[in-house]
Amino acid sequence: MYANIYDFQTGKVTRSDIRASLEQNKNVMTVLCDSLPSGLFSFISISDSVFFCKESSPDFTQQKRYLAGKTAGMLPPVIERLNEAKVSDSKDINIISTIAKMSRVNERIVEMPIGLNYINIYSLNGDFARTVCVGDELDDISEIEDRKEWNRMYTYADLRLFKDFWGVVSINEDKMTFQTGRKKYPSILLFDWDGKPLAELKLTRFVNSFDIDMVNKTLYVFDVYNDKMFAYDLSEVLNKIVRE
């Protein structure tokens, strides 16, 4: 069992041999790459020699996606389009920040923003691209720029990928309410790998994160207000949405 780790401060990528580390009671690490820039907004290890990176443009108005490494190929058109998103000069670049993860099953990447109402799914080989919008229309970045920061929406938190589907925590509250006293219970939205909605799990606790034990068909959520974890039987939902 291995884990590839990106050091945010140095840009170095190392591979940790987890089993050897446990057996030897020390970190067993191998340097895979020492030439990536520090401070990347996103990093995904595609392989031991190819890395998906998202880096700020020099003027801090865009976040540029690219592949780095020995055998990195050309970018598909979908990434070029995503790289066109930008904020105005001196505006908050985090408006277009996303959390990106890649499925090892189908090699599709999901990018979940924290302040926009749409999520992008795409493959690096260019054979699939889709945008999932939770709302009547896509958020306009320029309109969000014009709002005071406290009035901007906190849309999603936590992104989890599974074999047959993926999910996010939907917050949907403005930042002031979220920071000073949440009022709306969040929900967990589940989608298949083509972006089709599968289920909405409505919660009665103020959670920011979740995970699903697929073997025991159990949903785990963490309540940020009382530092407690809760478990729910998810067998009925999973029996409907998971292929045998």
Identify the meaning behind each predicted range.
Residues 31-48, 92-107, 112, 151-162, ...:
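Structural signature of eukaryotic scaffold interfaces centered on beta-propeller domains
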Residues 5-13, 19, 66-75, 123-134, ...:
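Short loop/turn segments immediately following beta-strands, especially the blade-tip
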Residues 48-58, 164, 168-184, 229-234:
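Short, conserved, GDST-rich strand-edge loop motifs in beta-rich repeat architectures
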Residues 3-10, 60-71, 181-196, 236:
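Beta-propeller blade signature
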Residues 15-35, 71-96, 125, 129-151, ...:
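Surface-exposed loop and turn segments in beta-propeller and other repeat-based domains
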Residues 2, 6-53:
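Asp-box/WD-like beta-propeller blade repeats and closely related beta-sheet repeat scaffolds
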